[in-house]
């Protein structure tokens, strides 16, 4: 046999491998993230775990939360709705031994799903998911470092010849204990992850690696204590979960309860079922600007790999639509940031349910339509509504009891309160404004009692000058007595310097057709 018949195919194969490695090396992390579009989580399948049941077979784990294993048809349909990335969360703990050796039957199942996703030219994010849960093993940190390295060594070697569409994510939601976060352990294991994957060779040398944030929370990850690993390939992205504000996104429903104050005024306290006021929008603007300044501007793209809202807790559907639309439109409008929807899919077992993967049914047609439009670039772009201003005006469109405003270290000159007064000539009414410094010390209290009692029924502006005090942190406005005689309509803050804000009313009006 001519030796060329043996050598030539080998030469061609090696040449193709080097060509592809060169192609991967030519794309930086931002170019890859920009192609990833919107993402979708195959939640509550391979990531499932149980507090009470023993899991002995892959099928038991995959179906534990009522979802079926991903199929070719399922992935094709998810792609059809506009998603270009599939996050594939995997919990490994039931099918690895004490040294981290993976059982073959589990690796086979994992590989089947990845092959389906990659075949559809979708990006696939593979991770180590609930192994970091408090019932898992990864929570033990440095004690199990060798096991963690061994686990990733096997995963990396299994998939080292896969193309750039496969992305590895180091871990998920770990190392937060009560009010203390173990940055040292996270930094150490993230570095071990990068070193292990890069040293496995093949396409892993240039693969995009997604580095777990500090408990994947934006606040903890943007801290000066958080550090990204050293990577000679310079191909990293940082992982963030966006469940903000907690009270709306993750707050469970509870029966409202009432109480009466000393004046006989009835108050009601209940769950936060609505979202979408100016402060909500400004929170998202502030958070995306924080991601931009902390990571994107420093050469690190951000993958927000979990976004969602509890759908089974009686939250207003319009607010759910609005929240998802705004978050995903922000991520689409910011270079270097992309989002993945967390979808548990099954209403019996899941708590964030948007699309029934088993039966190809969206639970809300507006949400389905909005995702598809955003994927095509046909969405209201938030940056078109950004403004620079020295004023911040907040409509108080809910029952008022106490309102807290955080200045984010901006110097406030005036606080202007617009209120409707009724019957105040005959009652003892106190409107209180407290200002705080960065140490939460009260630096000024304004009692509006004397001024208010001189007013007749009507709508008035009460102006409080705070320009000569240390008013850089926050204020609290509340009515201590006579709340039934006053309706607060609006609060305006005048700042010393201009800042980036949103033309809230115009943006709110622009997206109305997408949420109603």
Where are the language model's segments positioned?
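Active-site mouth of glycoside hydrolases
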Residues: 26-208, 213-223, 348, 367
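Active-site region of glycoside hydrolase catalytic domains
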Residues: 146-280, 289-309, 333-337
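Aromatic-rich peripheral "rim/lid" segments of glycoside hydrolase catalytic domains that contact
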Residues: 313-391, 501-507, 511-515
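Glycan-recognition and processing domains
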Residues: 382-408, 443-445, 490-516
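Extracellular carbohydrate recognition and processing domains
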Residues: 396-398, 440-470
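Extended extracellular/luminal ectodomain segments enriched in beta-structured repeat modules
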Residues: 408-416, 469-472
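Beta-strand acidic-aromatic groove motif in beta-rich domains, primarily in extracellular
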Residues: 424-435
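Short beta-strand-plus-loop segments that form exposed binding edges in beta-rich domains
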Residues: 477-484
């Amino acid at each position: 046999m001519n030796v060329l018949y043996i050598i030539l195919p080998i030469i061609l194969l090696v040449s193709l491998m080097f060509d592809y490695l060169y192609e991967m090396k030519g794309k930086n992390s931002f170019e890859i993230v920009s192609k990833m579009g919107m993402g979708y989580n195959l939640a509550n399948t391979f990531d499932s775990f149980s507090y009470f049941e023993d899991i002995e077979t892959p099928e038991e784990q995959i179906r534990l939360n009522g979802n079926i294993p991903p199929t070719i048809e399922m992935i094709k349909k998810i792609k059809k709705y506009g998603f270009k990335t599939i996050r594939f969360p995997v919990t490994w703990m039931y099918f690895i031994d004490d040294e981290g050796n993976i059982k073959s039957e589990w690796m086979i199942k994992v590989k089947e799903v990845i092959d389906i996703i990659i075949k559809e030219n979708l990006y696939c994010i593979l991770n180590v998911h609930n192994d970091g849960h408090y019932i898992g093993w990864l929570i033990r940190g440095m004690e199990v470092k060798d096991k963690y390295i061994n686990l990733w060594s096997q995963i990396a070697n299994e998939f080292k010849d896969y193309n750039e569409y496969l992305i590895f994510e180091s871990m998920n939601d770990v190392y937060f204990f009560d009010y203390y976060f173990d940055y040292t352990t996270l930094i150490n294991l993230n570095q071990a992850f990068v070193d292990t994957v890069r040293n496995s060779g093949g396409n892993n040398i240039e693969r995009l690696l997604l580095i777990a944030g500090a408990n994947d929370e934006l606040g903890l990850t943007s801290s000066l204590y958080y550090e990204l690993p050293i990577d000679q390939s310079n191909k990293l992205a940082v992982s963030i979960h966006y469940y903000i504000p907690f009270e709306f996104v993750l707050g469970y429903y509870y029966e409202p309860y009432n109480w009466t104050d000393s004046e006989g005024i009835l108050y009601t306290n209940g769950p936060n079922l609505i979202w979408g006021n100016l402060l909500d929008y400004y929170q998202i603007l502030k958070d995306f600007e924080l991601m931009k300044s902390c990571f994107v501007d420093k050469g690190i793209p951000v993958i927000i790999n979990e976004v969602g809202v509890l759908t089974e807790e009686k939250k207003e559907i319009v607010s759910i639509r609005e929240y998802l639309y705004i978050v995903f439109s922000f991520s689409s409008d910011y270079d270097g940031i992309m989002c993945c929807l967390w979808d548990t899919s099954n209403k019996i077992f899941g708590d964030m349910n948007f699309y029934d993967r088993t039966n190809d049914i969206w639970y809300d047609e507006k949400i389905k339509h909005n995702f598809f439009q955003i994927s095509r670039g046909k969405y209201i772009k938030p940056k078109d509504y950004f403004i620079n201003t020295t004023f911040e005006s907040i409509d108080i469109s809910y029952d008022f009891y106490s309102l807290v405003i955080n200045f984010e270290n901006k110097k406030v000159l005036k606080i202007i309160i617009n209120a409707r007064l009724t019957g105040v000539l005959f009652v003892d009414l106190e409107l209180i404004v407290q200002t705080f410094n960065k140490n939460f010390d009260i630096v000024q209290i304004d009692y509006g009692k004397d001024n208010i009692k001189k007013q007749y029924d009507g709508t008035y502006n009460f102006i409080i000058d705070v320009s000569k005090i240390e008013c850089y942190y926050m204020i609290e406005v509340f009515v201590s007595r006579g709340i039934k005689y006053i309706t607060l309509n609006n609060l305006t803050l005048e700042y010393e310097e201009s800042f980036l804000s949103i033309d809230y009313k115009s943006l709110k009006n622009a997206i109305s057709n997408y949420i109603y």
